[in-house]
C-alpha cells in the first residue's frame, strides 16, 4: 500500500469512528454524581482520591455524560485557562483499578478540554496519576507509591513522602511544563480540590463506549499517551509504563 492510499484509509477510519460519537460543547457536558461506594475497589478509589491544585491551564471538566455525548474540547487559542476555568455544571475525575503484579493500582484521570495553547494548539488533554496500595480489602491499607504522567515519561515516588499527603490523599499540582506550554502533574505541599469520582465500571454503557471510541488525539501520529487512559488496551499499557517498583 502506497503512502497516499494509507493516508486515505486512515482518514476514512477516523471519520467512521468519529461518526459514531456525538460531540457537544465542553461546558455543556453533565458530570456523573459520585455514587456511594459499595465494593472494596470503589471504597479504596474514594479513600485515595487525590487533591488537585490547578496553577496553569484548564481546570478538570467532565469528558462524557450519561447518554454518551462527549466533550468537543477547545482550540488551543488564547490564554492557557481561557474559557476553561471550571464548569458551572461541576467537575469530574475518573478511575479504574486492578491488580498489577502484586500491587493494587488505582488510576485516576482528569480531562482538560484544552491541551496546548498558542502555537502548539491541541484540543483535549488527559492528566493521569496511579496510586499504588497494598490491598483494597484491608481497613488499614497503605499507599506504597504514586506515579504521575510527566510528558513522555512518568514521575514516580515510592514510598510517598508525608509532606505530599493529606491523610490518605496525595496532593498534586497541575502546572506549566518547562519545555513547552502544556499542563503537567507534580507533587505539591499545597492543598488542592477534589472532584466527584466515577469509576470505569460505574459509567453507563453509552458513556464507556463513547470514551473508548472518541478521538482525543488530533495529531497525524497516534500515540496511546493521548488516548483516554482508562479504556481497554490503553489502561494495561499505562500501568506497565507507570510501574515504580
UniProtKB/Swiss-Prot annotation:
For the keyword Signal, the answer is yes
What's the short name of a Pfam family annotated to this entry?
A: NPP1
Q: Which residues are glycosylated?
A: 140
Motif (Hepta-peptide GHRHDWE motif) on chain: 121-127
GO annotations of cellular component type: extracellular region
InterPro entries, sorted: NPP1
What this chain does, per the record?
A: Secreted effector that contributes strongly to virulence during infection by P.capsici.
| Family stated for the protein in its record | Belongs to the Necrosis inducing protein (NPP1) family.
PANTHER family recorded for this chain? DOMAIN PROTEIN, PUTATIVE (AFU_ORTHOLOGUE AFUA_5G00600)-RELATED
Domain characteristics, as noted in the entry = Key residues/motif important for the effector activities are degenerated in most NLPs, including the nlp24 peptide consisting of the conserved region I (11-aa immunogenic part) and conserved region II (the heptapeptide GHRHDWE motif) that is important for phytotoxic activity.
- Can you name this protein? NLP effector protein Pc118551
- Origin organism is Phytophthora capsici
Amino acid at each position: 500500500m502506497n503512502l497516499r492510499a494509507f493516508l486515505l484509509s486512515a482518514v476514512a477510519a477516523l471519520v467512521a469512528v468519529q461518526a459514531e460519537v456525538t460531540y457537544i460543547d465542553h461546558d455543556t457536558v453533565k458530570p456523573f454524581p459520585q455514587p456511594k461506594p459499595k465494593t472494596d475497589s470503589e471504597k479504596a478509589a474514594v479513600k485515595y482520591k487525590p487533591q488537585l491544585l490547578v496553577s496553569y491551564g484548564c481546570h478538570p471538566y467532565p469528558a462524557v455524560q450519561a447518554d454518551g455525548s462527549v466533550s468537543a474540547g477547545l482550540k488551543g487559542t488564547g490564554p492557557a485557562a481561557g474559557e476553561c476555568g471550571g464548569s458551572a455544571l461541576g467537575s469530574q475525575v475518573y478511575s479504574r483499578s486492578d491488580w498489577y503484579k502484586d500491587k493494587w493500582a488505582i488510576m485516576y484521570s482528569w480531562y482538560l478540554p484544552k491541551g496546548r495553547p498558542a502555537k502548539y494548539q491541541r484540543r483535549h488533554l488527559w492528566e493521569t496519576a496511579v496510586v499504588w496500595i497494598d490491598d483494597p480489602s484491608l481497613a488499614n491499607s497503605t499507599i506504597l507509591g504514586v506515579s504521575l504522567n510527566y510528558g513522555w515519561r512518568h514521575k514516580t515516588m515510592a514510598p510517598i513522602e508525608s509532606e505530599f499527603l493529606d491523610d490518605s490523599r496525595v496532593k498534586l499540582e497541575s502546572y506549566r511544563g518547562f519545555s513547552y506550554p502544556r499542563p503537567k502533574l507534580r507533587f505539591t505541599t499545597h492543598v488542592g480540590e477534589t472532584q466527584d469520582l466515577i469509576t470505569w465500571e460505574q459509567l453507563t454503557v453509552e458513556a464507556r463506549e463513547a470514551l473508548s471510541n472518541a478521538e482525543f488525539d488530533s495529531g497525524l501520529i497516534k500515540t496511546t499517551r493521548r488516548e483516554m487512559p482508562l479504556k481497554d488496551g490503553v489502561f494495561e499499557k499505562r500501568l506497565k509504563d507507570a510501574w515504580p517498583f
